[in-house]
């Protein structure tokens, strides 16, 4: 029987995270590196990637590499797994984290519904959902070969519940339709692909609640008042979830959506 530390260890495995230079992505990469993995930072610009790669190498003494790619280009996204294997020798864990989020500065995005644009809707679905399809499809042969293949898709509470617009009243904030639709798609694609790729590859999702990013104090107060844990999330709240789903601690878990939202969605 394996012990807890052995099941949790990612030693000898390679983990890649899209959106890896961002707040949540870099936190997840550090957690995976601490658990023993070598890591690959995937993001849109090399200038964002390189500092994260250097920091992880220095902090954890592991191998770390970076790949710059625009996930709006699905063909480019599909080349990522091959590049990872060429540089790192293998691919065991894929965390699909990159996304346009509610605060992304897109035209026709963070607007009342009537002013949200079809073009931005299409862009969001391409990055938030189509890129996950392309990456999963291209990564599948390598993840099967690993013997420990795990995919973790990052969804959102707005993929499982409708928005409470009372949170946004009187503020220059909104809740884009394309964000909710794409994240709902992530949850269902997780279920679908978990049955298609089993038993060699496990596929699960993490659904984060709202993360504190110095939002308007009125929004923060409203959000916290309707959350049982009485606070917004912090990046470190997701460390346990990603290591659990990436590692053999969850070796009999697939097709699941782990909701980490402080109870926001249980009302």
Regions found by a protein language model. Give the residues of each.
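Short C-terminal tail/terminal secondary-structure segment
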Residues: 2-7, 163, 170, 243, ...
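Short, small/polar-rich loop/turn modules that mediate ligand/substrate recognition or access, typified
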Residues: 95, 148, 198-202, 253-255
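Substrate-binding pocket helix/loop in short-chain dehydrogenase/reductase
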Residues: 105-113, 117-122, 175, 223
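Amphipathic alpha-helical dimer-interface segment in Rossmann-like NAD(P)H-dependent oxidoreductases
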Residues: 123-147, 158-159, 191-199, 247
């Amino acid at each position: 029987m394996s012990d807890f530390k052995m099941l949790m260890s990612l030693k000898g495995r390679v983990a890649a995270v899209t959106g890896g230079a961002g707040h949540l992505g870099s936190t997840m990469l550090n957690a995976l590196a601490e658990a023993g993995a070598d890591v690959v930072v995937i993001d849109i610009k090399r200038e964002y990637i390189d500092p994260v790669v250097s920091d992880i190498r220095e902090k954890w003494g592991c191998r770390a590499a970076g790949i710059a790619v625009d996930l709006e280009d699905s063909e480019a996204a599909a080349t990522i797994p091959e590049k990872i294997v060429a540089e790192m020798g293998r691919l065991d864990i894929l965390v699909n984290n990159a996304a346009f989020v509610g605060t992304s500065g897109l035209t026709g995005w963070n607007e009342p519904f009537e002013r949200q644009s079809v073009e931005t809707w299409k862009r969001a679905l391409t990055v938030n959902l189509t890129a996950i399809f392309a990456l999963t499809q291209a990564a599948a042969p390598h993840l099967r070969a690993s013997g420990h293949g795990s995919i973790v898709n990052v969804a959102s509470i707005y993929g499982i519940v409708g928005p409470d617009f009372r949170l946004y009243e009187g503020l220059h904030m909104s809740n884009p339709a394309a964000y909710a639709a794409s994240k709902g798609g992530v949850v269902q694609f997780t279920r679908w692909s978990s049955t298609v790729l089993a038993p060699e590859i496990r596929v699960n999702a993490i659904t984060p609640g709202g993360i504190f990013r110095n939002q308007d104090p009125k929004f923060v107060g409203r959000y916290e008042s309707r959350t049982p844990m009485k606070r917004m999330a912090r990046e470190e709240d997701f460390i346990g979830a990603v290591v659990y789903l990436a590692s053999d601690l969850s070796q009999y878990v697939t097709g699941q959506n782990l909701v980490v939202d402080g109870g926001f969605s249980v009302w």
